[in-house]
C-alpha cells in the first residue's frame, strides 16, 4: 500500500503551518524560512525500507525506515526524535516523540494529490502536495 505514496511531490499549499511550528517551539527566523520554502518530497521504497527525502533551499533531510519499527530521526528544525511510521488503512502515519512531547503527520492520497495533516496538541496544519 505504501506504493501509492511513492512519487516526487511538490508542496503547493499550506494552512496553519506557522502556528504548528510556533507550537513546536521553532524560532522566528526558522519559521520565516519554513513558511516560504516549498519543499519537494520524494517517497520511495528500497527493499524492505521506505525512504522519505525532503529537499528545499533551506535544508535537505532523509529518513529511511521499516514500517512499524522505531528509528532515530533528526528533524529539519534539529529536534532529535524517536519516530515510527506505519500504515493505517490507506494512510501513512508518522509519529515523532521527543522530550516527553509527541507530534504526528498523517499522509493520505486524495484525488491524486498527497495531503499531509500535522498535529501537535490542539494545533493542526495541513499541507497539500501535487506530483512533480
From Swiss-Prot:
A fatty acid binds at residues 127-129. CDD domains: FABP7 (cd19470). Its main location: cytoplasm. Keywords: Acetylation, Cytoplasm, Lipid-binding, Transport. The modification N-acetylvaline is found at residue 2. Belongs to the calycin superfamily. Fatty-acid binding protein (FABP) family. This is Fatty acid-binding protein, brain. It comes from Homo sapiens. The gene is FABP7.
Amino acid at each position: 500500500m505504501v506504493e501509492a505514496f511513492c512519487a516526487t511531490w511538490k508542496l503547493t499549499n499550506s494552512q496553519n503551518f506557522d502556528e504548528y511550528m510556533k507550537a513546536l517551539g521553532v524560532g522566528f527566523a526558522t519559521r520565516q524560512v519554513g513558511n516560504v520554502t516549498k519543499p519537494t518530497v520524494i517517497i520511495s521504497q528500497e527493499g524492505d525500507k521506505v525512504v522519505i527525502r525532503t529537499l528545499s533551499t533551506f535544508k535537505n533531510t532523509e529518513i529511511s525506515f521499516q514500517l512499524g519499527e522505531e528509528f532515530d530521526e533528526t528533524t529539519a528544525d534539529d529536534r532529535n526524535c524517536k519516530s515510527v511510521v506505519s500504515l493505517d488503512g490507506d494512510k501513512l502515519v508518522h509519529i515523532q516523540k521527543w522530550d516527553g512531547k509527541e507530534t504526528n503527520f498523517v499522509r493520505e492520497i486524495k484525488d491524486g494529490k498527497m495531503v499531509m495533516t500535522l498535529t501537535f496538541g490542539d494545533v493542526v496544519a495541513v499541507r497539500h502536495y501535487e506530483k512533480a
